[in-house]
């Protein structure tokens, strides 16, 4: 597969959709697009003039707490969808220019038509750069899930210092696969690369987020819409 571009999709309860758009637009240095969808449940976060092409979208979901997923932009959605199915994915929904699929480990993702996006947006100091979707995967499904995403995207794997992580590197949005300690249902969250995590944490708190816990090289945060995400010690 030739992935031309990728989007981090922020999924939040529909009732919190406005709060999610406002917060993440501020985090990413962007403005919210006109709403799309039958209920106005989709929005793109468009970087301000000269800030690059969009790579973040927001969706209001009807059931559950939401989370995140990745959209892969390709030139041939039907062809790449068929290839994903051959690798073990399951087709959930399709229409012209869109295929919604489920990975072997249960993660939803989308293939969408590439619209010529190529300019990677810059980081917002000190908020960091939203550049990663982390797929939280049960131990029994983890190895096969890593193999699936590596084969699907063709993105190079970068060694990680901790064995529970596998990174598939790309821009503007890359994939981190995390092996969970228990057989929990699959989930996904957003990661931001932060040059100074303590400073970024203070910025996010001032913007309305709440710290949840600190890890070795990350801080788990809760956004104003109730979604979890991480600030991580990486160069933005």
Residue ranges and their predicted role:
Residues 1-21, 68, 72, 112-147, ...:
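N-terminal beta-strand motif that seeds the catalytic metal site of vicinal oxygen chelate
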Residues 1-53, 79-80, 86, 92-94, ...:
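Core segments of cupin and vicinal oxygen chelate
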Residues 28-66, 104-115, 155-188, 222-224, ...:
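Conserved short beta-strand elements that form part of the metal-binding/catalytic scaffold
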Residues 17, 65-105, 189-228, 233:
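Vicinal oxygen chelate
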């Amino acid at each position: 597969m030739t992935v031309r571009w990728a989007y981090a999709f922020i999924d939040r309860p529909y009732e919190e959709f406005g709060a999610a758009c406002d917060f993440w637009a501020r985090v990413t240095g962007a403005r919210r697009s006109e709403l799309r969808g039958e209920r106005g449940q989709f929005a793109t976060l468009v970087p301000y003039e000269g800030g690059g092409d969009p790579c973040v979208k927001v969706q209001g979901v009807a059931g559950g707490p939401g989370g995140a997923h990745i959209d892969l932009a390709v030139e041939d959605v039907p062809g790449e969808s068929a290839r994903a199915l051959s690798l073990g994915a399951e087709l959930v929904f399709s229409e012209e220019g869109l295929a919604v699929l489920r990975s072997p480990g249960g993660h939803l993702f989308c293939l969408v038509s590439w619209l010529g996006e190529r300019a990677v947006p810059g980081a917002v100091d000190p908020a960091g750069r939203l550049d990663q979707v982390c797929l939280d995967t049960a131990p029994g499904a983890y190895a096969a899930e890593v193999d699936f995403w590596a084969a699907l995207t063709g993105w190079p794997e970068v060694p990680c210092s901790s064995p529970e992580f596998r990174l598939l590197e790309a821009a503007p949005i890359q994939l981190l696969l995390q092996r969970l300690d228990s057989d929990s249902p699959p989930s996904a969250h957003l990661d931001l690369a932060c040059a100074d995590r303590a400073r970024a944490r203070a910025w996010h708190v001032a913007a309305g987020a709440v710290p949840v816990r600190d890890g070795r090289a990350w801080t788990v945060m809760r956004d104003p819409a109730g979604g979890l995400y991480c600030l991580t010690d990486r160069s933005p």
